Every structure is written in C-alpha cells, then in structure tokens.
C-alpha cells in the first residue's frame, strides 16, 4: 500500500494525496466481529462539548480488534487485509486452525496467506506475539502491553513502533517513536513489527468535505472570536491577539510541558518525548 497523487481536474483535487487502497479487501467486514458505534459529536451526557472539532462523520461499524492475542500456540492464516474507518492502521482478518476468526492490527509487510502465531514459542517474524523478555534487543515491536495480560496499549496507530533497547531484570527499556524511553515489565507481550500504513502521514485531504466525512469539524482561530470565547478574541478591527499564543483556557501553545509532575507513572519514564 502506498499513496496516489491525483490530477488537478478540479480545485479540490489540486494537491490532494490519498491512500492507495487497491490491495485491501473491498467487501463488508466479518459479520461476527463488528458492533455498532454511536457518534456523540464530542458531547458528554449533559450535551456539553468536552472535545472540540468532533462531528458526526460517516456512519461506521466498529471492528472488534484482538489486542490481547489470546489464542496461544494456535497458528493463524491471514485471510485478508482491510481498511478500518475507526483507526489509521490497517487491520488483518485471521483464521485460526481451530476455525475461530479475529481481527488484529496489521504490521508493515504482512500479506494474505501468511501464517502467524501468538505464544512464547513463536518466531521473531512480523505479526507474531510473545513476551518482551524473549524478544532480541533492537527489535521493533508494536501493540505493547503495560500490564501482563491487559492487552496492547502502546504503539497502535499507523507507522508507530517501539524499539527494544535493553533488558534490566524484570523490566525492559523501550524507545517509542515519539522519542520517549520507557520501562515496561518484561512479562508483558508485544507484537513483532512496525504498524502498517506508514504513508498515512503523507495524506492531504484536499477539501473540507473529506474532513467532515471523517468526523472532523472546522477549527476556528482564536483571533476571529469574541473576548468571552477566547483570550485572543475581540479588539477593534483585525488584531493579532496581543499576546503569545494560548489555548482557549490560557495555556501556552508553544512548547509548554503539560504532563503532571507528580504522575505515578513518571518513575517508568527515563526520557520524555521529543514532542512534549
């Protein structure tokens, strides 16, 4: 899977760069592995906006993903790769030898017909899942657990990864794609490989409508608002805001660290993210 550049037939296509999904499954998802997902438009139970820039978007079914890889020691064949509207990564439909099916996040390089397995006897190949203490130093992994048996949490979006840096007793050191270096229990499981859809960062939607299909509403500049709505609002005529850029709640937007200093998980982070 790569990207496709479109010809400038219309103004909205000029500069548009989209994903090439020609190799992905074009039919409906596996019926036994989907559920309904209701869009709340960023509102809570009282109807108050708690997440800005969220809209309805296109109707979608939720694909139930196996983040725990519970079928230990049972080989599974990749039936197909699919697009998932609920995440940036592609997903793979697995068919186990005992007849059960499940969806997993597809790693880069996985293709139809590949055989993968979960368990401590698995080979170091993309898609196989095993404990971190059994994975060689330097290996790229994804879908990493923070608690043994709790299911993968770290590195699940398109193109992300965690690299195993070293092993130290009951912990291992992982370097995340953000630059953060973090301690994780060695008994936690991870899946070998980098998450698929590496070209997702190169996509240019090209028009507002494509953002609305994804459920993204417009972002209004603070200087275009009234003083009651934003610290940059108001003024006579067009103004530049009159202060350093801040959020609607007055927090600096130019590199201010927002992580709490007394957070309990700080002891597991050896180096903070390059991205703040």
From Swiss-Prot:
The keyword Ribonucleoprotein applies. One of its GO terms (biological process) is cytoplasmic translation. It comes from the Bacteria. Disulfide bonds: none annotated. Residues 224-276 are annotated as: Disordered. Pfam families: Ribosomal_L2, Ribosomal_L2_C. Keywords: Ribonucleoprotein, Ribosomal protein, RNA-binding, rRNA-binding. Gene3D superfamilies: 2.30.30.30, Nucleic acid-binding proteins, Ribosomal protein L2, domain 3. Residues 254-270 have a biased composition (Basic residues). SUPFAM superfamilies: Nucleic acid-binding proteins (SSF50249), Translation proteins SH3-like domain (SSF50104). Part of the 50S ribosomal subunit. Forms a bridge to the 30S subunit in the 70S ribosome. Belongs to the universal ribosomal protein uL2 family. NCBIfam families: rplB_bact (TIGR01171). This is Large ribosomal subunit protein uL2. It comes from Ehrlichia ruminantium (strain Gardel).
């Amino acid at each position: 899977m790569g990207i496709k550049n479109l010809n400038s037939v219309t103004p909205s296509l000029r500069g548009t760069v989209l994903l090439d999904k020609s190799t992905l499954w074009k039919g409906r998802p596996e019926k036994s592995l989907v559920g309904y997902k209701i869009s709340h438009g960023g509102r809570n139970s009282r109807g108050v906006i708690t997440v800005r820039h969220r809209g309805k978007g296109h109707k979608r079914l939720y694909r139930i993903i196996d983040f725990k890889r519970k079928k230990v020691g049972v080989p599974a064949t990749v039936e197909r790769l699919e697009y998932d509207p609920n995440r940036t990564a592609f997903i793979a439909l697995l068919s186990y030898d005992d007849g059960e099916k499940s969806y997993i996040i597809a790693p880069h390089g996985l293709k139809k017909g590949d055989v993968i397995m979960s368990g401590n006897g698995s080979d170091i190949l993309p898609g196989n899942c095993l404990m971190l203490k059994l994975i060689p130093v330097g290996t790229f992994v994804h879908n990493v657990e923070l608690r043994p048996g709790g299911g993968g949490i770290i590195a699940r979006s398109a193109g992300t990864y965690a690299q195993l840096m070293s092993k130290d007793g009951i912990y291992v050191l992982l370097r995340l794609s953000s630059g953060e270096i973090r301690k994780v229990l060695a008994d936690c499981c991870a899946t070998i490989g980098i998450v698929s859809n590496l070209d997702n960062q190169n996509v240019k939607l090209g028009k507002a409508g494509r953002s609305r299909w994804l459920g993204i509403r417009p972002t209004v500049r603070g200087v275009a608002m009234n003083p009651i709505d934003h610290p940059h609002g108001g003024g006579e005529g067009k103004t530049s805001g009159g202060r350093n850029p801040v959020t609607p709640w007055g927090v600096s937007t130019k590199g201010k660290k927002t992580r709490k200093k007394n957070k309990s998980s700080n002891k597991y982070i050896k180096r903070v993210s390059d991205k703040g």
